[in-house]
């Protein structure tokens, strides 16, 4: 959400400003999503396609859940604190000093997102193979950085 404000004493300039920005806004924000919107409209017209979409969505939900379950169990086992997690794309690891921990992990080619008060792990983008053992690596980096969670 945003606003575009034009200030002028000329009605012609104000009208041109409005027309240009209507066109630009539609071209910038409406068109990129229109293909996806039309695709969803076509899918929802066909019960078979809806069933396939639901099955695919359930498959990805389960895949992310399995990854998160692995990480949460391993985090509990090694004493790495995490924020409560029910479902979703991200798990948050609370701490102050996340930049230091993430920098250390990057040296091992582990790329997490440092936040002001923690680290965000995208369980949606890390394979099960790579998520296994990750909690212990994060915990080791936290301990090496002398950070108290």
Report each predicted region and the residues it spans:
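Short, well-ordered loop/turn and helix-capping segments at boundaries between secondary-structure elements
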Residues: 7-8, 45-49, 140, 144
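Active-site lining segments that contact anionic ligands and/or coordinate catalytic metals
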Residues: 1, 86-90, 107, 116-118
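PLP-dependent enzyme catalytic core of the Aspartate aminotransferase-like
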Residues: 99-149
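Active-site PLP attachment segment
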Residues: 1-16
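Structural signature of PLP-dependent enzymes
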Residues: 15-37, 42-72
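Conserved PLP-binding catalytic core of the aspartate aminotransferase-like
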Residues: 53-105, 125
